[in-house]
A protein has these predicted regions:
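Eukaryote-biased, non-catalytic alpha-solenoid scaffold regions
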Residues: 1-178
């Protein structure tokens, strides 16, 4: 019976959010021809509430025009968490968009991950971003946690290709100034 299939479908997802399971079930069962609006709504809800890049791919593939896909990218940047945004923009190779996003989100926990994805494409811009982050941290105070954060960012700066000389100069400035 249909009820039995629904029960079987949900039985192996008991540990997860029931709403998410229901939405995933509805996405699988919606007829794209007759229920395209419902399908889009359910797919959008999955992406923006649960932040799974696979949901982005599904939703993107439902879009029929480039303008719709561009609008979806804008929505992703405003509604998804930074980790998901990083994954999606990287997978889509939207490096300029990811760089702009990183510039606006330097205080995010995932900022180093964004830079790792970008550093081969924009080494100078990534180095400059890190320079600003480290300088701001140095000027914000003292303390062990602050020192650990600065050291972590400095290690990331050191790994940006082609910036070895600039890194050495910046570290010399840091030692002289602070």
């Amino acid at each position: 019976t249909a009820l039995g299939r629904v029960r079987d479908e949900f039985s192996h997802f008991e540990y997860r959010d029931t709403r998410e399971d229901l939405l995933r079930f509805l996405v699988k069962t919606c007829d794209p021809q007759r229920e395209s609006r419902k399908l889009l709504n359910h797919a959008e809800t999955l992406l923006f509430e649960y932040n799974d890049p696979k949901d982005y791919v599904f939703l993107r593939d439902l879009m029929t025009t480039q303008a719709q896909r561009d609008q979806l990218i804008k929505q992703v940047q405003s509604k998804c968490n930074p980790e998901t945004v990083t994954d999606i923009l990287s997978a889509e190779e939207r490096w300029d968009d990811l760089l702009a996003y990183a510039r606006r989100h330097t205080r995010e926990h995932s900022f180093p991950r964004m830079i790792r994805r970008l550093r081969d494409h924009f080494p100078e811009a990534c180095f400059d971003l890190y320079r600003k982050v480290v300088t701001n941290l140095l000027e914000s105070g003292t303390g062990q946690s602050l020192y650990n954060s600065i050291a972590s960012h400095a290690r990331q700066m050191r790994d940006i290709p082609g910036q070895e000389e600039a890194f050495g100069q910046f570290m010399a400035e840091v030692i002289d100034t602070y």
